[in-house]
């Protein structure tokens, strides 16, 4: 880590106070499966930077369990039929691929990533068949007789039995990311008749994002990021975005360790932490009441900026657009405001002040303060 004396001071970045989450109208499954996230304001360009990174992390980075193999009484290979079962083994495999599992939070195998074998005994007798109209459906919920995993879709049909029988079924479940074809799945102690499946581990179905223009005060040169996330129910969209953010942070931390100069960001002053009356007394001061050079005072006067309130609400880029207003004047003004515990680009919305009404509001507050002093006198 570099010595703090070599730190670089950067202007503050506009950042959202929070990320807003909302349901997507008409989406199946509600907010537990589909949600929209809005983050604004962001500096220009950061919308696409964050949106693209989050999208990739959501699609390829999240882990979830999936069935990677199975075996069943009477099944020797994938290309066969089983007497008394409507579906052939190929269709049973397809149905197993549609199984959605999530793990109970407090149950874990050693190391957390090992595969686990789940065994179930399926017994179908004549009364079961009669009650089901001659065809007894065996669902994912029927196969999860051990309490390690929970089925998101327990009513999902795996196969259909047409005669009395007893079957032993073994499902092997593993954790992974993204999608893995069966050829890439390596199993320890694979059984002779154990059939390996392609596995869709990713719980994220779809991620879309777009970037809109938004404003801070009267400045419209900022981004609004809108991110829409759809999952299959194994994780909620809110969890998925939180996990993806942690994954990205983990990877960025590798580059942060480089022994280079550190950036210190100027932060916006929170008027909630300051006494509002004290701040108002500073805001209504005239520019000529603080010690600025003649050049800086004239620049502000030519820009029709008469009070500190009119000054601090201005974003720095806006000031630099004024005629004859250069870096030297900017530096002087920023230092003076820093002494007053103020800064450029302040959010004065708590006082009902914006760029469109700041001049009128400063006059109104100045009159209010004078009236208050006269009353006390």
UniProtKB/Swiss-Prot annotation:
The top EC class, named as a word, is transferase
Q: Which GO terms describe its cellular component?
A: cytoplasm; DNA-directed RNA polymerase complex
Give the GO molecular function terms. Answer: DNA binding; DNA-directed RNA polymerase activity; protein dimerization activity
Has the keyword Nucleotidyltransferase been applied to this entry? yes
The record's region (Alpha N-terminal domain (alpha-NTD)) falls at: 1-259
Q: Which reaction does it catalyse?
A: RNA(n) + a ribonucleoside 5'-triphosphate = RNA(n+1) + diphosphate
Q: Could you tell me the superkingdom of the organism this chain comes from?
A: Bacteria
User: Which is a GO BP term held by this UniProt record?
Assistant: DNA-templated transcription
Against SMART domains, the record matches this protein to: RPOLD
**Region entry Alpha C-terminal domain (alpha-CTD), spans:** 279-377
Q: Does the keyword tRNA processing apply?
A: no
Q: What is its EC number?
A: 2.7.7.6
Q: What does the comment on domains in this protein's record state?
A: The N-terminal domain is essential for RNAP assembly and basal transcription, whereas the C-terminal domain is involved in interaction with transcriptional regulators and with upstream promoter elements.
How does the record describe its quaternary structure?
A: Homodimer. The RNAP catalytic core consists of 2 alpha, 1 beta, 1 beta' and 1 omega subunit. When a sigma factor is associated with the core the holoenzyme is formed, which can initiate transcription.
Q: Which family does it belong to?
A: Belongs to the RNA polymerase alpha chain family.
Protein name stated in the entry: DNA-directed RNA polymerase subunit alpha
Naturally occurring in which organism (per UniProt): Chlamydia trachomatis serovar L2 (strain ATCC VR-902B / DSM 19102 / 434/Bu)
Which gene carries the instructions for this protein?
A: rpoA
């Amino acid at each position: 880590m570099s010595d703090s004396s070599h730190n670089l001071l950067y202007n503050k970045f506009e950042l959202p106070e929070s990320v807003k989450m909302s349901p997507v109208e008409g989406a199946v499954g509600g907010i537990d499966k589909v949600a929209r996230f809005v983050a604004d304001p962001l500096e220009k360009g950061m919308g696409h930077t964050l949106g693209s990174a989050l999208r990739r992390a959501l699609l390829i980075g999240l882990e979830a369990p999936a069935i990677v193999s199975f075996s069943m009484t009477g099944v020797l290979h994938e290309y066969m039929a089983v007497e008394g079962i409507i579906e052939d083994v190929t269709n049973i495999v397809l149905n197993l691929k549609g199984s959605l599992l999530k793990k109970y939070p407090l149950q874990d195998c050693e190391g957390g990533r090992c595969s686990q074998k789940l065994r179930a005994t399926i017994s179908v007798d004549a009364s079961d068949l009669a009650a089901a109209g001659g065809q007894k459906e065996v669902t994912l919920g029927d196969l999860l007789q051990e309490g390690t995993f929970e089925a998101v879709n327990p009513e999902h049909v795996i196969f259909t039995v047409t005669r009395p029988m007893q079957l032993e079924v073994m499902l092997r479940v593993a954790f992974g990311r993204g999608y893995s074809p069966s050829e890439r799945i390596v199993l320890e102690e694979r059984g002779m008749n154990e059939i390996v499946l392609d596995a869709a581990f990713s719980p994220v179905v779809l991620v879309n994002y777009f970037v809109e223009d938004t404003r801070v005060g009267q400045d419209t040169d900022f981004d609004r990021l809108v991110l829409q996330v759809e999952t299959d129910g194994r994780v909620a969209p809110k969890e998925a975005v939180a996990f993806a953010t942690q994954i990205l942070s983990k990877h960025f931390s590798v580059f942060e360790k480089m022994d280079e100069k550190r950036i210190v960001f100027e932060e916006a002053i929170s008027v909630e932490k300051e006494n509002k009356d004290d701040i108002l007394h500073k805001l209504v001061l005239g520019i000529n009441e603080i010690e600025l050079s003649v050049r800086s005072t004239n620049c502000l006067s030519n820009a029709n900026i008469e009070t500190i309130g009119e000054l601090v609400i201005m974003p720095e880029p806006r000031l630099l657009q004024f005629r004859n207003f250069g870096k030297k004047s900017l530096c002087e003004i920023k230092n003076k405001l820093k002494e007053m515990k103020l800064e450029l680009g302040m959010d004065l919305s708590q006082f009902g002040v914006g760029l469109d009404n700041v001049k009128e509001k400063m006059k109104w507050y100045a009159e209010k303060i004078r009236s208050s002093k006269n009353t006390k006198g």
